[in-house]
Amino acid sequence: MDENKKRALSVALSQIEKQFGKGSVMRMGDRVIEAVEAIPTGSLMLDLALGIGGLPKGRVVEIYGPESSGKTTLTLQAIAQCQKRGGTAAFIDAEHALDPIYAGKLGVNVDDLLLSQPDTGEQALEIADMLVRSGSIDIMVIDSVAALTPRAEIEGEMGDQLPGLQARLMSQALRKLTGNIKRSNTLVIFINQLRMKIGIMMPGQSPETTTGGNALKFYASVRLDIRRIGAIKKGDEIIGNQTKIKVVKNKLAPPFKQVVTEILYGEGISREGELIEMGVEAKLVEKAGAWYSYGGERIGQGKDNARGYLRENPHFAAKLEADLREKFEPTELSREEGDEDTLEDAM
């Protein structure tokens, strides 16, 4: 850069600092680039697929999927993991459907969980913004975008046509929220539902879409698609679901990774089941017929018995998890990838 341009830049930077404060503009090399903090999800497979060891703090995350696919279960397990590490959690229950007994079974400390059941979408997002700006919340879940009903819709008549009202509400709220989320280093998770598109579609185009417009798609750093793909049986009794989770978008590591895990009724994501599956894949756990062995010791005949053995011997499970992390965890846990999406497109 020639001297005239350097002087002009120096004058501009000094004027910006006077008007907006020191640090308003800085060179990237002037600050240490820190690894993004992450909150574990409760699923070792998903933490590894996300590439940073969990869901990123200071970012917006969207989790969507069909009904009863495990969306709320996944977020409650993330809350439990955050609380175990001394964090503070908030749950904005726009659906008015949170079951505290089930949350407790998943490890959530319901006595310390901040809960809001707002009447309107505006109230829910205003409460979320105030909690984020307080700087004291580590993780916040909004369940769900589809239930964030605009005030005009609630006060209107049944059958009133109010096109685009919820999409405008979400776009405005996210413009306001994202800066505060980054400054307060809060993880904000939006749970979303699926709807079917109406009209003519191009061949190969998915008929499914999420509610609340396009704003959330652009502002989210991570988007997870979670779906039930099968049942887990113990004899004739169904004890859980086999669930596929796909990382549809990831600004912090390579996207499009997917995992298949087990969600057991009343227990959530089966940590022991994941350890067995990953152990077999990594050849750390030997499978001979129906028997599973680890470190030369038989741990059970059939997956259900092996799962029970690991649950009864937590030190054994912890050793297997440590071996798996050593084998699977990437050496570079955080890499911010460029995203060419412009926020103007979200409007």
Swiss-Prot record:
Residues 327-347 are annotated as: Disordered. Transmembrane segments: none annotated. Residues 327-336 have a biased composition (Basic and acidic residues). It comes from the Bacteria. Residues 337-347 have a biased composition (Acidic residues). GO terms for molecular function: ATP binding; ATP hydrolysis activity; ATP-dependent DNA damage sensor activity; damaged DNA binding; single-stranded DNA binding. ATP binds at residues 65-72. Pfam families: RecA (PF00154), RecA_C (PF21096). GO terms for biological process: DNA recombination; DNA repair; SOS response. InterPro entries: AAA+_ATPase (IPR003593), DNA_recomb/repair_RecA (IPR013765), DNA_recomb/repair_RecA_CS (IPR020584), P-loop_NTPase (IPR027417), RecA-like_C (IPR049261), RecA-like_N (IPR049428), RecA_ATP-bd (IPR020588), RecA_C_sf (IPR023400). Its main location: cytoplasm. Disulfide bonds: none annotated. Can catalyze the hydrolysis of ATP in the presence of single-stranded DNA, the ATP-dependent uptake of single-stranded DNA by duplex DNA, and the ATP-dependent hybridization of homologous single-stranded DNAs. It interacts with LexA causing its activation and leading to its autocatalytic cleavage. This is Protein RecA. It comes from Xylella fastidiosa (strain Temecula1 / ATCC 700964).
